[in-house]
Structure formats: structure tokens, C-alpha cells
């Protein structure tokens, strides 16, 4: 699969000393590292090796090493973030291209696409860590054991909740503290926090009733995170409404703040960004033609009545006809399988012209 080839490709980014980075915005290779028999036989040594293969900063590597489940959770976060990013942008000119040279160039600029990468990476790590705690894969955390619910006396806290409290603490420490002066570093930090806040806002309480004939005299309740696909959907919406910002100085603290650009720019809002808004510094390129930021859209598959005009950037599209075989007229047979016929049909495939 093209996606797996992208994830298995190695990446070398230029290190940035201003803050800690991870996932789709980090220095590590976008690699899905398999759990081998060697890892099962020598778990501690193996997880140290994985932490070393993820090109982390010194503090991040130490945090990865201190829990046997850390490396697996970090890899899961990277994979989950990459898959969701490519899913959310599958119909866009920039389709979350993660090949090394394109991603490295993109991360050097403060585009709105870069903002999304920071948010989805921090969200992925927050989500993966909270789930790892509740699944018992981490030694330093367990289930969410501190319910703060109304009418607690009527509820029995017996479910295994996702441990967002520990996850937030871990991610904040892992990604580093808020920088004071550099605008780009502050913007990246802000977008990291947006990803974490979307995770927190999506926490739901799930309950199961116990009692005679379903009377629900006792309820077992626990907290669960929203599915990560829902998180990705919300972050994509925030990408669509992201705000361009500049830099100002807070007279009370002397520290820099992010704010709307000093001069009004046509097409951009002067709205002061909220803590839940994605923000960016630089206007994005069109992504129509091959550049340092993307391979362009030449040859990209599109959908005639949906996005060919947009993705192909006015160059038009080619039409090819092909015959495909698909399961059809499926029926459930007792017991217990589905029986289908194989039907052939002709379909048209549309790709962008050069």
C-alpha cells in the first residue's frame, strides 16, 4: 500500500532546538516498528532499542525508556496520527504527504497544514497514552481512578476509564514547556495544546446498569475518550477555520503573545485567536504543482462530481475505463457465513492531467 510505504520510509529532519517535537512533527522516522520475537524474549532491552530508533530528544528518550510500554505507545501514536491525517485530507490538494523531503520542508514553515500536523500529533499521543493506561500496557499508570461525577453515591465506579489525567501530564512534559519569545515556537506549542484540548472535550461517561429486570438500581460507570476518527474530524474543521497570527508583547509580563497580524490582510480575519483555534503564520502554497512541499496533483485520482475541478487546479482530468469484479447479491446462510456472487462491472477512473 502507498500509505504503508510512506510510513516505512525513513525521514531526516533538521533538528530545532526551540522546543520538543514528536510524531508527524518530529525527527524520528515515520516507521511502524513490528513487535518481534526478540522483543518478547528480551522486552526491556528491545524497548530501549525502539526508543533509540525513534529519534527523540534526550528528555523524550528518557521518558520513553522509563516504562516498558512507552515505546509501543509512542509508535501507536505516530501510526494513528499519520493514518488519520491522510484520511482527513484524502480529497484535498495537500493529502498529508508524509514522504521525508516534503514533510521536512513543510515543517520549516508555519502553514495551516503544519498547524494541523502539530495538533494531530499531540492528540494522537494523548489518546494513545490514555488508552494504553486503561488497557494495562503501562506500568506507571492504570485506569482513571478519580471520578468527579455528580451523585457519586448512586454510582459504582467499576469500569476501567481512559486515564486522561496521566496522559495529559505525560504529554505536556514530553512536548516541553511554553516558549517565551520565538513566535514560531509559541505557535507550535499553541497548536499542540489545541490537539490535547480536543481530546479532553471529547471525554464521555459510559454507564452500564445492574439490577433486577434492568431496574438500574446500581450503575457501573467509566470515562471513555471519543474514537480517534472523531478527533481527526474535529481537528480538520479547526484547520478549515484556522487563524493567521503575528506577534505582540504582553506589557504586563514582557512575554510574547500570538495575535492577529498588525496590518489587515484581505481574506484574513482580525479575530483574536482562542485557545481552541488552530493558528498559523505563513500563507500556504497552492500544492497544485510539484514543489519542495508536495509532489503536486498531477496523476492524482479524483471524483468527477466532487473534487476534480479543485484538485486538478483547472488543468482538467483524464478518464479511463476499467472492468472490476466485486462481491454482489450476498446472502447470510445458516449457520454462519455470508455467500456472495462475483459480479463484473465497468467503471470510470478520473486522474488529474499534468
From Swiss-Prot:
Family annotation (Gene3D superfamilies): 3.30.2460.20
Region Disordered, residue ranges: 246-271
Keywords: Developmental protein, Disulfide bond, Extracellular matrix, Glycoprotein, Lipoprotein, Secreted, Signal, Wnt signaling pathway
Cellular component per GO, a single term: extracellular space
PTM comment text: Palmitoleoylation is required for efficient binding to frizzled receptors. Depalmitoleoylation leads to Wnt signaling pathway inhibition.
Family in the record: Belongs to the Wnt family.
Name this polypeptide is given: Protein Wnt-9a
Lineage: Eukaryota, Metazoa, Chordata, Craniata, Vertebrata
Amino acid at each position: 500500500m502507498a500509505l504503508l510505504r510512506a510510513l516505512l520510509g525513513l525521514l531526516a529532519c533538521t533538528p530545532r532546538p526551540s522546543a520538543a517535537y514528536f510524531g508527524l512533527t518530529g525527527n524520528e522516522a515515520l516507521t511502524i516498528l513490528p513487535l518481534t520475537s526478540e522483543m518478547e524474549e528480551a522486552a526491556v532491552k528491545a524497548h530501549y532499542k525502539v526508543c533509540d530508533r525513534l529519534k527523540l530528544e534526550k528528555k523524550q528518550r528518557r521518558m520513553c525508556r522509563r516504562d516498558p510500554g512507552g515505546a509501543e505507545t509512542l509508535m501507536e501514536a505516530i501510526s494513528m496520527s499519520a493514518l488519520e491525517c491522510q484520511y482527513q485530507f484524502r480529497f484535498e490538494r495537500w493529502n498529508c504527504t508524509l514522504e521525508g523531503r516534503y514533510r521536512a520542508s513543510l515543517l520549516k514553515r508555519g502553514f495551516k497544514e503544519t498547524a494541523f500536523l502539530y495538533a494531530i500529533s499531540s492528540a494522537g499521543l494523548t489518546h494513545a497514552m490514555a488508552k494504553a493506561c486503561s488497557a494495562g500496557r503501562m506500568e506507571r499508570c492504570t485506569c482513571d481512578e478519580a471520578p468527579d461525577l455528580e451523585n457519586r453515591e448512586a454510582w459504582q465506579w467499576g469500569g476501567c476509564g481512559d486515564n486522561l489525567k496521566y496522559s495529559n501530564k505525560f504529554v505536556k512534559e514530553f512536548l516541553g514547556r511554553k516558549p517565551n519569545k520565538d513566535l514560531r515556537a509559541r505557535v507550535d506549542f499553541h497548536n499542540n495544546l489545541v490537539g490535547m484540548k480536543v481530546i479532553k472535550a471529547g471525554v464521555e461517561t459510559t454507564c452500564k446498569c445492574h439490577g433486577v429486570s434492568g431496574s438500574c438500581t446500581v450503575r457501573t460507570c467509566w470515562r471513555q475518550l471519543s474514537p480517534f476518527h472523531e478527533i481527526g474530524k474535529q481537528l480538520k474543521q479547526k484547520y478549515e477555520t484556522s487563524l493567521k497570527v503575528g506577534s505582540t508583547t504582553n506589557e504586563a509580563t514582557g512575554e510574547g503573545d500570538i495575535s492577529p497580524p498588525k496590518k489587515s490582510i484581505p481574506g484574513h480575519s482580525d479575530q483574536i485567536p482562542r485557545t481552541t483555534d488552530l493558528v498559523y503564520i505563513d500563507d500556504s502554497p497552492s500544492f497544485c504543482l510539484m514543489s519542495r512541499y508536495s509532489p503536486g496533483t498531477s496523476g492524482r485520482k479524483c471524483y468527477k462530481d466532487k473534487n476534480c475541478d479543485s484538485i486538478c487546479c483547472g488543468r482538467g482530468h483524464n478518464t479511463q475505463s476499467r472492468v472490476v469484479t466485486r462481491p454482489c447479491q450476498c446472502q447470510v446462510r445458516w449457520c454462519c457465513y455470508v455467500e456472495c456472487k462475483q459480479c463484473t462491472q465497468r467503471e470510470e477512473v478520473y486522474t488529474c492531467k499534468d
